[in-house]
Amino acid sequence: MDVQPHFSLPTPIYPITLYKMIHLKEVKATIKPGVELVAVSKFHPAEVIQEAYDEGQRIFGESRAQELREKQATLPADIEWHFIGHLQPNKVKYIAPYISLIHAVDSLKLLNEINKQAAKHNRVINCLLELRVAQEATKYGMTPDECLALLESGEWRELKNVQIAGMMCMASNTDNRAQIRQEFQRARACFDEAKARFFANDPTFCQRSWGMSEDYDIAMEEGATLVRIGTAIFGEREY
């Protein structure tokens, strides 16, 4: 799918890094109040992340544990790192010391491992449950019914070093914006049911992570509190 940013891009007459930062400012101008921007920096070098940081961005999203580990060691300590990709249980130990939010928890097994590794560092790690609402077999995550069943089991309540803070999803890779909207609405309905049934008195269950470069405008209309934007900020990787 050819990703089109939601604004007209200027002719790239500036050095590549400065040109990218102009994208960051324009994207930020489109983010609604109450929504946080996760700048998806995966596959981009630390130098580009540093420039975005210098422009005021503090939340960055990565999807590979080793790559994140290397970047975290060299970049400012006050960056809020989010892990946004599929996370294998055996990789949790590499990010547990510093990760702020894990977006894509798709099983009780993974929750247990995050809890185990967080305890080693005397931390509570915030996590989002990943929903599979897209009509694509390649997407990870739980169906809404599977997600609610996990919560119904109550086993997660015994985990003292993880905090379930909300839900995450990815919409289908399609030009059909009505379909994308319906998928976000399914995710919001699941979130609302879980909130009412399991987290009614827990204000920390409040995050809805959906929307990327090509569909974040719809996501914000459908209740997103976090949008994960990479290409519209940094462009395609050219390194």
Model-derived segments and spans:
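Short, Lys/Arg-enriched N-terminal segments with co-localized hydrophobic residues
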Residues: 7-20
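Conserved alpha/beta-domain cores
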Residues: 18-214, 222, 234
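Short, charged, intrinsically disordered terminal tails
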Residues: 237-238
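Divalent-metal-activated hydrolytic enzyme cores
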Residues: 225-226
